[in-house]
């Protein structure tokens, strides 16, 4: 089948009321941006839908990119043709014959009459086209109106006809750039890239901050995080990566504070630095990959202590998810194989033998009085390295 158009289906955007056009226009822009590496495409809105003209491009390659755009729940390859009812029926027959060759046994026709001057109603169109198809291939396939293996969808519009069948699922969500911007604390593990992706799926642009302890952690570990940011950029567009060396902070904690509190104290510094960066970059929230009880610092008491040093909302989309579910998403979005490459991070290098699991905020705050917090924070901020990551 020679497809010449994609029908883009969106979900939540359809119930946005008076603001719907804002989301639609952003979605169109995001689709165009996603397709730039392939070519220049005509992406437009018509009859309350979004379409992509395929021209001579490989439809499978284009669909694979379009389905990554947040806000899209499905993409349908279709054939758009001149406004002629007999032509519509011939295209429907050709499409059904391909489905028969692929092994399908039952079908149903669904029709939409966009041109009200046409002599048949939508239901009458379905019956007529279905009868025509049965007369041609009824010995090889049966009708099943309740649970068909194949749906042949036919539309008779004011200026053209259209036939399509398959729907390739998208990721849903809202168009990137419609819900502000967030700063993600991006490590090299499995969780934080998934958390970043999930928040971006709700329409937030994302930047990332990565904490390292070079030379105690290797340059390879930083390259690994860049690779993860590059994968995320496939979905999120450009990702600005802020690389922060907190070695001096960790040394100060080790010299002046209780060993068991080192992880919580380090996390509090990370949150402070992330908030400072967020204020500078006009980010509205922080993102972390934390999940209740997954590690010692992620108990409810630990999260309370880390939250206490920031004013921005902290989004933790993985908070109640099982590890297996997080891994499934990581595999789906393509970050898993990179995340499991063994490299030490700044937390594991200075991990205490017996970290405190139920820290008390007042005790942690008292421990911090031994540190010059403002100087330590400002010193590392002054040395931040910034890189824009694009796919």
Curated annotation (Swiss-Prot):
Binding-site residues, ATP: 185-186, 210-211, 267, 289, 298
EC number from the UniProt entry: 2.8.1.4
Enzyme class: transferase
Classification via SUPFAM superfamilies: Adenine nucleotide alpha hydrolases-like, THUMP domain-like
SMART domains: THUMP
Keyword presence, Manganese: no
Pathway membership, UniProt: Cofactor biosynthesis; thiamine diphosphate biosynthesis
Known catalytic reactions: [ThiI sulfur-carrier protein]-S-sulfanyl-L-cysteine + a uridine in tRNA + 2 reduced [2Fe-2S]-[ferredoxin] + ATP + H(+) = [ThiI sulfur-carrier protein]-L-cysteine + a 4-thiouridine in tRNA + 2 oxidized [2Fe-2S]-[ferredoxin] + AMP + diphosphate; [ThiS sulfur-carrier protein]-C-terminal Gly-Gly-AMP + S-sulfanyl-L-cysteinyl-[cysteine desulfurase] + AH2 = [ThiS sulfur-carrier protein]-C-terminal-Gly-aminoethanethioate + L-cysteinyl-[cysteine desulfurase] + A + AMP + 2 H(+)
CDD domains, sorted: PPase_ThiI (cd01712), THUMP_ThiI (cd11716)
GO cellular component, one term: cytosol
GO biological process, one term: thiazole biosynthetic process
Domain THUMP: 60-167
Predominant location: cytoplasm
Matches recorded under NCBIfam families: tRNA uracil 4-sulfurtransferase ThiI
Functional summary from the UniProt entry: Catalyzes the ATP-dependent transfer of a sulfur to tRNA to produce 4-thiouridine in position 8 of tRNAs, which functions as a near-UV photosensor. Also catalyzes the transfer of sulfur to the sulfur carrier protein ThiS, forming ThiS-thiocarboxylate. This is a step in the synthesis of thiazole, in the thiamine biosynthesis pathway. The sulfur is donated as persulfide by IscS.
Protein name, entry field: Probable tRNA sulfurtransferase
Organism name: Clostridioides difficile (strain 630)
């Amino acid at each position: 089948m020679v497809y010449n158009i994609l029908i883009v289906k969106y979900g939540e955007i359809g119930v946005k009321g008076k603001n719907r056009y804002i989301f639609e226009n952003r979605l169109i822009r995001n689709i165009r941006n996603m397709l730039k590496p392939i070519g220049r495409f005509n992406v437009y809105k018509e009859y309350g839908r979004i379409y992509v003209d395929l021209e001579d491009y490989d439809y499978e390659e284009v669909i694979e990119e379009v389905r990554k755009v947040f806000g899209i729940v499905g993409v349908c390859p279709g054939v758009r043709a001149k406004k002629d009812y007999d032509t519509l029926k011939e295209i429907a027959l050709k499409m059904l014959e391909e489905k028969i060759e692929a092994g399908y046994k039952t079908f149903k026709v669904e029709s939409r009459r966009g041109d009200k001057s046409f002599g048949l109603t939508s239901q009458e169109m379905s019956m007529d086209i279905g009868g025509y198809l049965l007369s041609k291939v009824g010995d090889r396939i049966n009708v099943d109106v309740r649970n068909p293996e194949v749906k042949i969808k036919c539309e008779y519009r004011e200026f053209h006809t259209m036939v399509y069948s398959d729907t390739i699922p998208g990721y849903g969500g809202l168009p990137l750039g419609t819900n502000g911007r967030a700063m993600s604390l991006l490590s090299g593990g499995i969780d934080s890239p998934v958390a970043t992706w999930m928040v971006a799926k709700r329409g937030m642009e994302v930047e990332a901050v990565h904490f390292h302890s070079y030379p105690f952690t290797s340059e390879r570990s930083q390259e690994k995080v860049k690779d993860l940011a590059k994968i995320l950029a496939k979905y999120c567009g450009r990702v600005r990566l802020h690389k922060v060396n907190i070695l001096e902070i960790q040394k100060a904690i080790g010299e002046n504070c209780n060993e068991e509190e080192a992880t919580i104290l380090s996390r509090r510094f990370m949150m402070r630095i992330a908030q400072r960066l967020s204020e500078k970059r006009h980010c509205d929230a922080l993102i972390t990959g934390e999940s209740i009880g997954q590690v010692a610092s992620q108990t409810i008491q630990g999260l309370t202590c880390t939250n206490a040093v920031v004013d921005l909302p902290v989004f933790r989309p993985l908070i109640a998810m099982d590890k297996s579910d997080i891994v499934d998403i990581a595999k789906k979005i393509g970050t898993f194989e990179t995340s499991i490459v063994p490299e030490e991070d700044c937390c594991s290098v200075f991990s205490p033998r017996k970290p405190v699991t139920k820290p008390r905020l007042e005790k942690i705050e008292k421990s911090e009085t031994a540190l010059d917090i403002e100087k330590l924070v400002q010193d590392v901020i002054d040395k931040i390295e910034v890189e824009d990551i694009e796919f």
